[in-house]
Amino acid sequence: KYRILISFGNNEKGKSLLRLANGLIKKQKNTSSITAMHLSLSDEVNTFNIEDKEKNSFHQIIEESQLLKQDITTVFKATMDIETEIADVANHGDYDLLLIGLGKSIFEGTILGKVIGLTTRIINPDRLIDKFTGKEGLFENSPFDERTRQIISRTKMPIGILIDKELQQVSRVFIPIFSSEDSFLIDYAQKLIYNNNSEIVLLDVNGYLNTNFVMKSAIDSLEQKYPNNIGLIADKIVRKEFLDQQDLMLISIGSWKQLVDSRSTWLSSVPSVLILKH
């Protein structure tokens, strides 16, 4: 069975993560499952309000699951330490993929928020992202906040981090390939094509798609099986018009760091982004 665990804070993000998970498995419902987990800090929950809190937390995601005709299992927990709890549940629960959202608030007033087009607010120079990456510089440390970084470092399984720009569907997906390490992304492309009939465009940033045997053969077999669902571009310049048509960018964690460090101008036009670590 292919088992996905979604951990969400707010309802909108939970719905986006569910749409994404559904796109990865919807034709394989007998051999897959989705668990949606909401964690609350213990001091916000007491025995009197726990049921109400649980109902409110899942109301919208359950409605969304009915629209998608997707069964889900829900898990609600009160905990003192949300990051540790997410990693523990993921590591001990026999899951194949953990999906979490990256809060928009993290980007407010940061340079990265501006770079990826999530905030237009003027930046306060004192705050210059220094909590975001430690003091050493713009992105050397990690293009993630502390919470996400803790979850990534503690989780011993594949993890996807969604930067959610109101993701509605995953019909058009764009995958930049930066290095031979990115070959695992082809597995996700295949899942989306098979389960969701997604159209996938691969961007060959450094020419690996032709020179790397593993990647080339994986893509060749996908092209033979699904000629209408896969396209390649070798253009270094990604146009805004192209990005505007995409629902999601799928990228590995290493390539995300490279992309952010390169400050590519097109970053501000990216759609929702799923950053994958395997």
Predicted feature residues:
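Short loop/turn motifs at secondary-structure junctions
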Residues: 30, 90, 94-95, 199, ...
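Well-ordered alpha-helical segments embedded in enzymatic catalytic cores
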Residues: 20, 60, 85, 147, ...
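Short, small-residue-enriched loops and turns at beta-alpha junctions
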Residues: 43, 208-212
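Amphipathic alpha-helical segments in well-structured domains
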Residues: 51-61, 144-148, 215-219
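Soluble catalytic regions of membrane-associated enzymes that act on cell-envelope
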Residues: 34-43, 47-104, 113-114
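Intrinsically disordered or low-complexity boundary/linker segments at protein termini
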Residues: 1-14, 102-209, 220-278
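Non-transmembrane accessory domains of multi-pass membrane transporters/channels
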Residues: 1-58, 69, 182-184, 193-197
